[in-house]
């Protein structure tokens, strides 16, 4: 059985699979948890940290994205390392330096034991093409946002099993989507497992999930192309570049409004003011904490936002 490599944020899954390992995005188990960590800032990292320390999350090693995304993961990842878990620290360059990032990929490859099957990258590229087609179906009102989101969020690790993941993609149905407004969801993904279904219930069709879209947008066929493409990971670079990219997606997807999800104790919360200054759309900002079903307060806010968008000219 292949060794399981936990990843704390986006790490090119192409390279992990090519090294003969099985990636597991530790964040993807968090929304389904009922945990209430005693020691936490961000619940996302605290939940997976406790699951690793207790053995509930069975991984052979851990890759911590220590530069270019989540800051809390750096400390919680070190706690996992101090418990004896083999751990590697992975850094995205803020300035997009391709040579630097290629060196990061080379170091990661060494940690993982070296490339064994680079041909598997072609299959991952094909699966990502299917993900893009699925995303396009959603934009064209031919797939439910909740179905598409559950698929796209899994592209960070392709569910650790390419065959099973392909079957999952096969099972997503086409649907005629009825809604009152088209919205974008920016920021980190909601920690609430039912968020998309709740939004759909109020007539909000989420046609853009910012972070999961990065998982299918970026790719490559070898170290050089992976380095070139993944340095464009929007969450790891200047906020100005990210705003420009979001603006372009909002225009193409013809959105009526924007939901900015923020996580308690996450540095990305500080970006809300910037988005409000530069995105010329009605914006609803919501903040989550623990992994739980959507609260009644959140439902009321989503309902009010939907009603406001419906009456806007």
Identify the role of each PLM range:
Residues 1-120, 196-199, 207-313:
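Trp/Phe/Arg-rich N-terminal binding region typifying the photolyase-homology
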Residues 2-3, 106-219, 235:
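A charged, amphipathic alpha-helical module
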């Amino acid at each position: 059985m292949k060794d399981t490599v936990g990843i704390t944020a986006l790490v090119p899954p192409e390279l992990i699979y090519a090294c003969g390992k099985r990636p597991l995005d530790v964040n993807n188990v968090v929304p389904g948890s009922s945990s209430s960590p005693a020691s936490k800032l961000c619940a996302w990292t605290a939940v997976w940290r406790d699951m690793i320390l207790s053995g509930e999350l069975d991984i052979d090693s851990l890759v911590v994205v220590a530069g270019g995304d989540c800051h809390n993961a750096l400390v919680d990842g070190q706690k996992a390392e101090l418990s004896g878990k083999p751990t590697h620290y992975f850094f995205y360059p803020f300035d997009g330096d391709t040579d630097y990032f290629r060196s990061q990929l080379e170091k990661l490859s060494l940690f993982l034991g070296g490339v064994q099957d680079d041909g598997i990258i072609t299959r991952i590229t094909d699966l990502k093409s299917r993900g893009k087609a699925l995303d396009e179906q959603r934009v064209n009102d031919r797939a439910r946002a909740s179905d598409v989101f559950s698929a796209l969020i899994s592209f960070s690790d392709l569910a650790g099993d390419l065959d099973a993941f392909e079957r999952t993609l096969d099972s997503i149905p086409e649907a005629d989507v009825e809604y009152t407004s088209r919205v974008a969801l920016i920021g980190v993904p909601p920690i609430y497992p039912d968020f998309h279904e709740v939004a759909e219930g109020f007539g909000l069709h989420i046609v853009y999930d910012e972070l999961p879209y990065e998982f299918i947008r970026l790719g490559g066929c070898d170290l050089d192309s992976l380095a070139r493409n993944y340095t464009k990971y929007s969450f790891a670079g200047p906020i100005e570049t990210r705003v420009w990219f979001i603006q372009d997606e909002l225009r193409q997807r013809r959105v009526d409004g924007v939901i900015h999800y923020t996580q308690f104790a996450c540095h990305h919360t500080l970006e809300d003011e910037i988005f409000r200054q530069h995105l010329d759309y009605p914006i609803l900002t919501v903040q989550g904490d623990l992994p739980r079903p959507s609260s009644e307060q959140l439902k009321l806010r989503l309902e009010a936002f939907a009603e406001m968008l419906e009456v806007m000219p």
